[in-house]
Amino acid sequence: MKLKSPKSLESRQSPRVEGKVWKVSEEDAGLILDKFLAAGERLGSRSKAAAARERGRVFVNGAEAGRDQIRAPLRVGDEIRVWEDRPGSARRRATPFTAGPLRILYEDQFLIVLDKPAGLLSVPLERRGEEESIFDQIVQHLRSHGKRKPLVVHRIDRDTSGVVLFAKDARTQAALKQQFRERSPERVYLAVVYGHPEPSSGTWRDHLVWDQKALIQKETHPNDPRAAEAISRYKVVETFESTSLVEVRLTTGKRNQIRIQARLRGHTLVGEARYVYGPELLRPVPFSRQALHAWRLGFVHPVEQTSMSFEAPLPEDLRDLLSDLRRP
């Protein structure tokens, strides 16, 4: 697969993505972005302007409006565009999933460690209806051995593949959850992102708040009483023409943490459908899900008190993606 460098926003408009465009006049020069958009002939209110910006639908001179542009005064001739149909904002159809045998990495009388395929929920959610989860599959597995239901310790996103851990009794569950609260487990992910993160290794530290209505993480001020600190350490493993393979180690484990932290730095995950902004033609690598894999999980066995570490091999779709990216 030969990757193309993104061209200018104007020259790569998609007929499926419509937007409104305004040029800043002398009369409006000096206004900040939200106030400009709040005018009645534009979006009509500051709240609508802020919402559009937070959803990544606002572009200034062809680039997404970032943190540094929120308070910067606009200049005569600046082009402001608001995308009305932001690619990825609509609910995406679930990745096709065909049930197969459980890929058990380890099992004893206290816990079970599995390699979860992409497209399968970790645990059932009421709003997902009858969609199958790996929890349901473990229930059937344990039932066939005359045992009780598994107990949730942690979870990974439906379209993220890799290592996930469940307990078999309440005491084991409590001990494992305590390790996660203390941030002691080793949680290592592999992700394919757009761009080349600089520096090539470092720490991502953000304050996030979960938007219950939109079902996404949003960046917020550290003083926000709702703020939750998110910390990840990253290292670029391999670079390609316009993408990179990155190893990410979680210190905290917030929902969608890697996906939003990568996006906040301009390195959206390949295949990302939720944390994506602007025209999809700026993301030229086709992939059916976010390119994220829970590669390694390490923890202390709560009963035997021995250190344990498990790795899930890259699934076929990610192996194929990397092969394509390495191709000249």
Segments the model singles out, each with a brief description of its role:
Residues 49, 131-138, 170, 181, ...:
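Pseudouridine synthase
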Residues 155, 222-226, 235, 286-289:
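Short Gly/Pro-enriched turn/cap motifs at secondary-structure boundaries
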